[in-house]
Each structure stands twice: as C-alpha cells, then as structure tokens.
Amino acid sequence: MVGIDLNTVEEEEDEEEGGATGTVTAPAEARAGGAVCLELWHACAGPVAPLPRKGSAVVYLPQGHLEHLGAAPGSGPGAAVPPHVFCRVVDVSLHADAATDEVYAQVSLVADNEEVERRMREGEDGAACDGEGEDAVKRPARIPHMFCKTLTASDTSTHGGFSVPRRAAEDCFPPLDYSLQRPFQELVAKDLHGTEWRFRHIYRGQPRRHLLTTGWSGFINKKKLVSGDAVLFLRGEDGELRLGVRRAAQLKNASPFPALHNQISNTSSLSEVAHAVAVKSIFHIYYNPRLSQSEFIIPYWKFMRSFSQPFSVGMRFKLRYESEDASERRRTGIIIGSREADPMWHGSKWKCLVVKWDDDVECRRPNGVSPWEIELSGSVSGSHLSTPHSKRLKSCFPQVNPDIVLPNGSVSSDFAESARFHKVLQGQELLGLKTRDGTVNTASQATEARNFQYTDERSCSINMSNNILGVPRLGVKTPSGNPGFSYHCSGFGESQRFQEVLQGQEVFRPYRGGTLSDACIRGSGFRQPDGNHAPGAAFKWLAPQGCDHHGITTSVLPQASSPSSVLMFPQTSSKMPGLEYIYGCLDRNENSRHFKIGPTQDMTRTDQTLRLWPHLISGKVLDECTRNEKLHSPVSGAEHESNNKCLNTNGCKIFGISLTEKAQAGDEVDCGNASYHSRLQSLKPQMPKSLGSSCATVHEQRPVVGRVVDISAVNTMI
C-alpha cells in the first residue's frame, strides 16, 4: 500500500525521483516521488475528484458520509451530530489499495464552529480569509501526456497484445526508430505502488499499428483485469512513464472499499465523529472519489456561495461527472422542487433540490442534488417543465357543441357516433361547454351529459358506417334561431372495426334520454299526415324554426335484438303509426328545396315486410348528408293532447320511394336551403331488388344504401 502526503507536494515538486523499483511502503519513499504520484493518483481517481488542502475551512456533512458508506436512511448518530459541521483540514494523505489499485484519501478534520460563526457574523468570505479560491482546490491541471483506453476482449486475451492508438503512442511513449524494418523498443512503467512493469513496444501489422506484446499478458493476469476496465499511461515532466488502472466493476457495482478503508469506515465510526465534534478533537474521514457520486466534504467558500445563488423551479443546470471511458462530461437538467432527503437530518441541505435529468434513459443518478454540485445555466418557462412525449392516442370525452343547452342548465350536443369510437389523437380533447348564461364549463358537465345514455349499448348504436342508433328518451331543446349548427356531408362505408379516428373526423354518440331527433336538419323535414294518434303516445317530432311539419308519436319504444341483424318488435297487437318521410329534391333552376311526402297504409306487423332506409328506424331520423341528429325538448301536455288526434296509419315513404305496395303521394314542403343541391341529387336512394319475404342479410362493411330490414316476424308495435 502506498501513502502519499499531499501536504508536502509543493515543497518537493522539483526533486527528482530515485531509481528504486518494487513496491513502496514507507511514507518517506512515497514523498520522494510525490509530484508524479499525485498526478497518477488524480488520473486514477478520475476527472472529478476534488480534495481540500491543509488548513482550509470545509463543511462536513455526516448525512452524505452515511450514504457514501451505504448505510440505510435514518441510521447513524442522528441528533448527536449536526447536519453541517464546520471544520478545519488538519491533514490529507492519498492511498491506493495493494490488491485492487483502488485509490482513496484520508482527510483529518477538527471541528471549528466558533471560527466559522465569527466569520459569518462579520460577513467575511471564506475564500478571501483562507487565501483560497476556485483555483486553490482544483485538481492539478490536465496532464498533457496521458491517454486512457478501455480494454477490449482482444486486449485481455493471452494470445494478442495491447493495441495503442497511434496518436497516444507518439505522445506518451518514447519515439521509435522508424528506419528499422520492424521498429520496436522496451518500455518501463511504474504503477501507484512503485512497481516497475516492462513491455515490448512494437510497430507492425497490416495496416501497421502500435502494440504492447511481451509482458502485457503477465500484467493483465497479475492485476486481474477484464474487458471493460481501463488502463492509463502518463509521462511526467521528467520523462518517466507511469501506469494506472480504473476498474469498471467498482464504478458500476459499487464494490467494497479497500481493506484499510473497510476497517475504519463503518457506521460506528460516526459515533466517534460525534464525540470528536463535541470535544473538538481530530477525527479521520476516508473518502473514495470514484464511489461517491456527491461530495460530503465541501470547501467552505463553495458551500456558502451555493446559498447566495437564487435557486428556483424551472432553472436549468449543469453537473460534471465521470463517464465510463474515464472522461469528464456534463449532464444537464431542470430544477423541479426542493425537499429534505432524510427527515432525521432536519435542516440539512444534502440533496435538497429535486431535479429532472434531460437524459432520463441513460442517467443512473438519483433525482436529488445538492446546491453546491451544480452550475446554473439559465431558466425555462413553466410550460416546458413537463416531459416531452410523442403524440399518442388517449381516451377522450366527446367534443360537444357549446351552444346546445340541456334542461338542467348544462349542455348537450348533436351526436351521431357509434359507441365504439373511444379514442382520438392528442389535441382533440374536450372543449369548453357553454351554459345559458354564457359561462364555459368543462369535463365535469360533459361527464354528466354522457350519463344520459341507454342502458343497452347493443340496441342504441352500431358502427357509424351503418348509422343505426337508438332513440333518445329525454327531450333536449335546440335554441330557435341558433346559427351555430353546421353540417357536413360524409360518405358511408367505413369499416365497423375502425376503432380510432383522426383529428377533425370525430362523431359522437347521442346523450341517453331525450325525445326523437329533430325532424328538420337545415333543409330536410318530416310531416305527420292528419289522423288519430295512438293512445298513450309518449314521443312526437316537433318542427324546428323554419320547417313546416307535424309530429308523430309512438306508445312504446321498440327494441332491436341486434344492430347487425333483423330488427324484431315483440309487441303483438298494435298497428304501425302513421309515418311520412320527406325526401328532399332540388330543382336546379330554382333556389328552393322540395320534399315529397308519402302517407302510410294501415298494416300490421304480422303480414307486412317493412323495407326501411337505414337512417329511419323506430322513429329516429338521421340526415343523409351529415349523419348527425338534433334533439328536442320534452313535449308539453297541451301539445301531447293536440297531436294525439293526428295519427294516420296509411303507409310509409322514405326519400320519395314507397315502402309498401299501397304508397300514396304526399304534400310538398319547402324549407328553403340550396346548399346541398348537388349532394342530395347524388344521394337519391335506389331500392334494391326484393330479397324475399322472410329476412335480409346485412353486411356490416358494405355501403348502407338500399339495406333491407325484415320485420315480417314482428307481432306488434306500440
């Protein structure tokens, strides 16, 4: 084991080293080569291994010392030792373990709280009083003639040698005589213990390269080096070659300290520290710079300066660290908060800053740092504190029209979406909702509105390609004269299995509850011919402003056995209510829109097959161009009695095409909207050929035009 007294380095820098070889054990022998050994020790310790100087003022943090020893949080003397102990450095000596070549330092300290308190009262700066500054505690300047290489599998094999980069060989090794056919030379290098190692340096191969051959395998076996460890060579000012190692296993796995360090550095030693602090006697701290990610012996000036900086959430910082290839690098991050790392050490500033690293994947450091470890590099706005992430699908509330008001003062919207559309892309989340007083509500009321849904999901909706939806049960009123409704044509034929939609392609399911759909969607409408209503009618269609039509009623909402199968109506004795659908036809020579109305004939469900256009099922109307529906307010009692006299069961027409053999011509209604001139002409339905009188096959992914729904087995309808 080698002991190097750091305090005598400056006095003996110019002394030449003796030619002794072998392992050096006496401190005097170590001091003889102090300057070179100091460089080698720092080279093996890594680029971030600061050490205090003799006589300097430091702050000792026992909490960090416990973490350095691997003790569990909450262990140690606790209240017996203050979280920050102001000390004076009595001595610093450097050591290297004989078995592993691992470097560590022994720092002797004495508590000096009174002197520090006096300085703080007088407002003196620690660096000025000690004659110290940043340069005084820095590690020695970068050694110009040094290289470090991580060993590969071929470097550690017994058959080959150690391949040296050409630039490194020319910088560190003595020059070769390239006039020879095979240039070579003998190299002698000393390790931390003063042991000499001899290697044959040759320049050969195709292409030619520098190799260490003879003697290299013996060095690998003796030091027990493996692939991943690092070997470094440096040449001092006197031209002598030095050799050191850095073990990757100790850096990655935090292997135990060397033997001397293990004998003294344990949890019980903190009890001795507590006693030494109380009586102001000297105590010793053993410090391994490669195993400690954070310093727990801090220069006084550095400790005090860290508290003069205004740390705040959102500030960016840089932190120096040693990479696996033994080079110095900087890691960056953002401050996101503050905390006490261990409640037992109340008031401790050890790792009190909570940070977020920019390289979360590669970073193995904890999310807490100490103020004196980092260098501030700027600040960011609060909107950048969140983690950047790629666009991904997320569950979403339906995006609603903010101008539709529910009876309870909340909001509603026009919906025509299948229940299977559950996801949208990021940025398509729920918008604000507008109430009667103009205020905007958000997700809470949208959730309330979504609760107005059918109990049986199967009977209410299928995929939007089929556009078959159940009838709502609770009236929702559309404000008259509202110009905020806009409808856009959309084609049919989307697959029922399409589970996701892109931005701008969302359609939404209806709220559960409400009366039948709006009979007029900006230019189309429905009309109920004169006749008697069925008794006990519970639903009717009301005309919105600008449309002239009557309502129709039914007594009980029929149920569908399955969205993709023939609709079955279990009632046995009721007759079909009078029903008319107004098919819109545009006159190309006029800015008007005409609708043909066809009354239905009396018929029972047991002897008629009802061929329905897919957009009109069980009293529900969907706009062909928009696939949207409008909802109405509940029917008042007076309107209910008045419209109960208008039921007629003569027949049914859809888009001007009779659904029965006894279809009759109807009236014409003008709703005045020519915006869908070409669209509605192209969408004029064509009835398919008869598929028989029993049932019709429904293909879910085919276009819905001309779909036949067989209800010949229907007994009744209320």
From Swiss-Prot:
Q: Which residues bind DNA?
A: 147-249
* Induction per the UniProt record: By auxin under dark condition.
Q: Where is the composition biased (Acidic residues)?
A: 8-18
Biological process terms from the Gene Ontology for this record are:
auxin-activated signaling pathway; regulation of DNA-templated transcription
Lineage top rank: taxon: Eukaryota
Q: Which family does it belong to?
A: Belongs to the ARF family.
Its biological purpose is as follows:
Auxin response factors (ARFs) are transcriptional factors that bind specifically to the DNA sequence 5'-TGTCTC-3' found in the auxin-responsive promoter elements (AuxREs).
Listed name of the protein: Auxin response factor 2
Native source species: Oryza sativa subsp. japonica (Rice)
Q: What is the lineage of its organism?
A: Eukaryota, Viridiplantae, Streptophyta, Embryophyta, Tracheophyta
